[in-house]
Amino acid sequence: MLPIRMIAKMFLRPRKYPGCQEFSFAPRLSRLDGRFVAVDVRARHGSFGTTLRLRPGTTDIETFAQIFLHTHYRTHDMARHSEIAAYYQSCAKPLVLDLGANIGLSSLYFAKNWPKATIVGVEPDEGNYTLFSQNVAGHERIVPIRGAIASKHSYARIINPGASEWGYRTEINDSKSGGLVALSVQELLDRHSDCEPFICKIDIEGAERELFSRNTQWVARFPIVIIELHDWLFPRSGTSANFLRAIAGMDRDFILSGENIFSISDRMGNPEQVETNDARAQAGIGV
């Protein structure tokens, strides 16, 4: 079945998909640097609108369905949504990190739901990053970065290049021969020191094992961490173990949404506690 027919078929039963209550969609074929499917997306309430470019024969359409139809990053139905929304409103410049941004669909979803946030998306694969940049063009608050993410500033190479478009993995090393800069979360926070940490979304295909191996003080600064773990993809590799150790002593709720785990701080909304958390995080003390 042609990709445009597949997408159109999705919209024939809008009640099946929560995203159809949030957005209107208009799929069409388009040509720009090669043939792809374009989907015009408009919010049913508010002024958000964008055109998504998806590659036929890839996992782009499945990613689109997860984010915009099944709304796996939606918090509005969670018991703590009002608390999350209040915290967001209290931030002058909320910061969202989209680590493993793929082609930018998650960044755009965050831009719709949290319109005053600065969204920094990091994606290692060149093809994904090119489409990411095209998809977010015109959205001034979305900052695309090509690179990997790691526990410290280093370099990386992409491995398993034959994987699907959402399955690229990175291997961290200290040699520039890798050709790809790997940034730490602290570097991103330093670059945007005028912003207040809000959401950190992580989908980095098993690289969470290295990311959480050290220098995890930043975790306490984010009221919301959204992560997809990959033990199912790499059995007996312990890819989630370091994440679990990093958050084990923290007071947080954990909520499953699709393939993602939402980790929501119990201290959110308490200014004195947030200030204390920041101080303890800087000192390397778990909260």
Outline where the language-model segments fall.
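Phosphate/nucleotide-binding beta-alpha loop and adjacent structural elements of enzyme active sites
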Residues: M1-V287
